[in-house]
């Protein structure tokens, strides 16, 4: 019998850039490639990008240590410069390990932007995330922030 472990986390960042600029880092394929392309040593196998409600984004490849990951996302709700809601499935070495929903909220604050990312994950069939999803998402959001400079 399969098992499910539920988990959630929230990440908050403040940047000096306007919400429109931060939103474009998600909405524009070239801008997103600067921060969402895998860690150093990542060998990309597949990538697609269709940023619209109902659109799909995928990224798969092999990490430096040999692990193969696949991200398969569907955008559920997009309010330009304010909100992005998406759900996604992650595979690790060909095995489905999780199904998640995430919401990114962008709010003007002190002449810049407050980003709040909240994610709810269902970790499947004995996969022990041990905080790696939150760690990886923090790394991605930090990389996004650097790409804005």
In which residue ranges do the predicted regions lie?
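A short, structured loop/turn motif at beta-sheet edges
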Residues: 19-20, 50-52, 76-83, 105-114
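Beta-strand/loop substructures that line and gate deep hydrophobic ligand-binding cavities in soluble
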Residues: 85-138
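Glycine-rich portal/gate segments that line the openings of hydrophobic small-molecule binding cavities
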Residues: 44-89
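Hydrophobic pocket/interface hotspot
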Residues: 22, 32, 57, 75, ...
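Short amphipathic alpha-helical signal-transduction/dimerization elements
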Residues: 27, 141-149
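Charge-dense, helix-prone N-terminal extensions
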Residues: 20, 47-48, 58-61, 110, ...
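Hydrophobic ligand-binding cavity/cleft-lining segments
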Residues: 1-43
């Amino acid at each position: 019998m399969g098992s499910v472990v539920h988990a959630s986390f929230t990440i908050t960042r403040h940047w000096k850039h306007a919400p429109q600029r931060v939103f474009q880092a998600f909405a524009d394929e070239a801008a997103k490639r600067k921060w969402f392309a895998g860690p150093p040593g990542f060998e990309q196998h597949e990538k697609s990008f269709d940023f619209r409600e109902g659109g799909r984004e995928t990224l798969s490849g092999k990490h430096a240590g040999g692990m193969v990951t696949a991200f398969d996302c569907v955008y559920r709700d997009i309010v330009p410069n304010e909100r992005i809601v998406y759900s996604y499935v992650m595979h690790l070495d060909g095995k489905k390990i999780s199904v998640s929903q995430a919401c990114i909220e962008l709010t003007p604050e002190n002449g810049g932007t407050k980003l709040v990312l909240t994610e709810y994950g269902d970790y499947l069939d004995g996969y022990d995330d041990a905080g790696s999803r939150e760690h990886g998402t923090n790394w991605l959001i930090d990389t996004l922030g650097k790409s804005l400079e």
